Design a protein with these regions (language model features):
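Helicase motor core with emphasis on the C-terminal RecA-like subdomain
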Residues: 1-19, 23-34, 39-327, 377-380, ...
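C-terminal helicase lobe
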Residues: 200-203, 222-233, 245-252, 257, ...
């Protein structure tokens, strides 16, 4: 409100969005919110439409090109503009934003800026240039989980010299934490069934793969569990939005999902979180369990662990970055073009990455960011004669550095699972905090009265949800695809 740059770290569910919504409503000008989470953008837009009507818009992949062009013509009429960091690389959008009075520039999930953060996004590193190009508005950087090193990196990356920091403990004392060890996958499935049948819902079960979300949903339905659906990033946008709404309206008591679910679902009465697979780092774990108990009521987070789990997070980490052989293959493809031309448009390089080298979007972002940093990509063109073996080896070395950091974070996660002390204390210590006082329900090492989380009322379990059936009802279709 006073025009000062701020970095704020607040626990999940403690009103981070209110930190920019309230000032945005009280001040003149437009609030520009950068978020990497498409579902969260859509959720925020839906909520704000109740307050500012049609003066809110999200620029992301959910919008068609025509919709984006139409919205750009009236940017100044919007009170809140949500945008992905990738969209801010559009010269056309930046040109239009320069014409708008941006009173507040919000960086949501700001830990994505730091290469040492658990969810580093290269395009976040370019936000300092965007801020300068649109007139250096006041900056608000928000995160729920960041170490002191990451907070420092956020300030430096955004060029915030005299920044005010509001940093609160990441502890959620109303969420008890438990780890349950099993020997086999079958035992784990049975343990999941027992927990789902025992615990008061609504609940969320996290898995590390799309296939497992579908497999477990089918398993639970086969055991008589109703009001359950799966959710993952491979589903169509309409399908995902339907499931979110059914969960929000308590028509679904349980969602079996990947990490794609949750950030866009601001549901206050989620009572339990179960991890069927553990995430690759502690910060992700805190984010995910933080979706329980946002109303302050007692909730529980349970992690199921078997000896067969430990290879999965390693493969997830390795899939996040291009391998040495993939980088070498890409360079060979690009160097072949040197005999035809001196430079390639960025669009053609992107096409080679996706189609010939079989890169995914994450790999392409990584390659593009580092080639831009090294000056190999300039003014949206790749200088082919600069693609030396030295440059290739620097990219490979950067991957190795990133992998070592991720493996270290994974070891911290595994240590927490096996720890022989207070789980809450161990988690807080990773972020430089201490547990304050004793809790009735803390963790399985200290004490948990499990009956506090037992089903206390008949839940709406006769609603056997099927998203295909719901889509048919909405669109009046007899069969999907007609």
């Amino acid at each position: 409100m006073e025009g000062k740059d701020v970095i704020a770290m607040l626990p999940t569910g403690r009103g981070k969005s209110m930190c920019y919504q309230l000032p945005g409503l009280m001040q003149e000008g437009t609030v520009l919110v950068v978020s990497p989470l498409l579902s969260l953008m859509e959720d925020q837009v839906t909520q704000l439409k109740y307050v500012v009507k049609n003066r809110v818009i999200a620029f992301n992949s959910f919008r068609t090109l025509q919709e984006k062009r139409e919205a750009m013509k009236r940017l100044a009429s919007y009170k809140f503009i949500f945008v992905s960091p990738e969209m801010l690389q559009s010269e056309l959008l930046i040109r239009e934003l320069k014409k708008v009075h941006i009173s507040l520039f919000v960086v949501d999930e700001a830990h994505c800026i730091s290469q040492w953060g658990y969810d580093f996004r290269p395009d976040y590193k370019k936000l300092n240039v965007v801020i300068k190009n649109i007139g250096s508005p006041t900056v608000l950087a928000l995160t729920a989980t960041a170490t002191k090193d990451v907070l420092r990196d956020i300030a430096e990356s955004l060029n915030l010299e005299n920044v005010t920091q509001h940093v609160y403990s990441i502890d959620r004392p109303n969420i008890a934490m438990e780890v349950q060890f099993v020997e086999t996958i079958e035992e784990k499935k049975e343990a999941l069934l027992d927990q789902v049948m025992y615990l008061q819902g609504p609940g969320i079960v996290y898995c590390s793969s799309r296939a497992w979300t579908e497999r477990l949903t089918e398993y639970l339905r086969g055991k008589g569990v109703t009001g359950v659906a799966f959710y993952h990033g491979g589903m169509e946008h309409e399908e995902r939005m339907l499931i979110q709404q059914q969960f929000m309206n308590d028509q679904l008591q349980l969602v079996i999902c990947t990490s794609a679910f949750g950030m866009g679902v601001n549901k206050s009465n989620t009572r339990y979180i179960i991890h069927f697979h553990y995430p690759t780092n502690i910060a992700s774990y805190l984010q995910e369990i933080g979706r329980a108990g946002r109303d302050g009521e007692p909730s529980i987070a349970i992690l199921l662990c078997s000896p067969l789990d430990h290879d999965l997070p390693i493969s997830i980490i390795e899939d996040e970055l291009p391998s040495q052989s993939q980088i070498q293959f890409l360079f060979s493809l690009l160097q072949e073009r040197m005999f035809q031309t001196k430079e390639l448009p960025i669009e053609e390089v992107e096409e080679i990455c996706y189609n010939a080298a079989r890169f995914n979007e994450q790999y392409w972002r990584f390659i593009r960011y580092h080639l831009e940093q090294l000056g190999i990509i300039q003014q949206r063109k790749l200088i082919l004669e600069s693609l030396s073996d030295e440059i290739m080896n620097r990219l490979i070395a950067e991957v190795e550095i990133r992998l070592r950091n991720k493996y270290s974070e994974l070891e911290n996660m595994k240590s927490w699972i096996q720890v022989k002390e207070c789980r809450r204390e161990y988690l807080l210590r990773q972020f430089g905090y201490r547990k304050e006082g004793e809790l009735k329900n803390c963790c399985d090492y200290c004490h948990i009265t499990k009956t506090d989380y037992k089903k206390r009322q008949a839940q709406q379990s006769d609603f056997d949800y099927n998203w295909e059936t719901e889509l048919q009802k909405l669109f009046g279709l007899e069969k999907m695809g007609e």
